[in-house]
Design a protein with these regions (language model features):
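Glycine-rich phosphate-binding loops of nucleotide-dependent enzymes
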Residues: 1-248
């Protein structure tokens, strides 16, 4: 298992948000976590990525305990995430945004006397990432003037540019039009090839299109984990989240 959660719990005061989540995700798997608002999906992502420390349980990345580690250390171990709110450097160009992530991953530190433009290894990886997210032609555009869909694509590029092989995407298609969503799905499919993807997403079309398996989180507990076809037909999942044909 690339990512394992064992009886993971998180409480804020007397309020239990995550209630004993156990989940295993295989290397190269595309895994979606779905559930109603307030189910604890973003909290679970925050636990895995190190923004929150769990109240109990274990989180293993490639067999190594990461529960309670700070985000930068987890990132160094090969896990990166995006957020519901786009997290980019709006005043930097598309190229510079990607290069910042690459420089971090390569361990380059700020040096007043040395231009980052002369770092061949960083330049090559930046160019590869730009091509992968289809933004080579937009490389010199300030990130702040990109369309919303382009900014989301850039954020995915920043996420993978650091060399992470486990990617957490939080609502990657939220706020997109139908055509933008279709393009985003193909982009996510391409950039996660050979990587492990864990995704929180409300658009069921996206979920059933991309996911190898789906976990359903309700009130901080996983009530089902299975392949998309069985999740769609699961009576407990229909009652808790998806609804039935009669509800349409």
């Amino acid at each position: 298992m690339t990512l394992q959660l064992r009886d993971v719990r998180k409480s804020f005061g007397a309020t239990a948000i995550i209630r004993g989540v156990t989940l295993g995700i295989e290397k190269g798997e595309r895994h979606a976590i779905i559930g109603p608002n307030g189910a604890g999906k973003s909290t679970l992502f925050n636990l895995v990525s190190g923004r929150f420390a769990p109240s109990g349980g274990s989180i293993l990345l490639k067999g190594e305990e990461i529960a309670g580690l700070p985000p930068y250390r987890i990132n160094r171990k090969g896990l990166a995430r995006s957020f519901q709110v786009t997290n980019i450097f709006p005043r930097l160009s598309v190229y510079e945004n990607i290069r910042c992530s690459v420089l971090w991953s390569l361990g380059h530190k700020y040096n007043f006397w040395k231009s980052a433009d002369k770092l061949a290894d960083a330049h090559e990886r930046t160019e590869r990432t730009l091509a992968l997210i289809r933004m080579s032609a937009r490389r010199n555009v300030s990130a702040g003037v990109l369309t919303y869909a382009e900014q989301r694509a850039l954020e995915i590029g920043i996420t993978i540019a650091a060399g992470a092989d486990v990617i957490l995407l939080d609502e990657p298609t939220a706020g997109m039009s139908h055509s933008e969503t279709a393009n985003a799905v193909e982009l996510i499919r391409e950039v996660t090839e050979g990587r492990t993807l864990v995704m929180v997403e409300h658009d069921m079309g996206v979920v059933f299109n991309l996911a190898d398996r789906i976990s359903v989180l309700v009130y901080g507990e996983i009530i089902a984990t299975d392949v998309p076809e069985r999740i769609r037909e699961n009576p407990a999942v229909q009652a808790a989240y998806l609804g039935t044909a009669d509800d349409a």
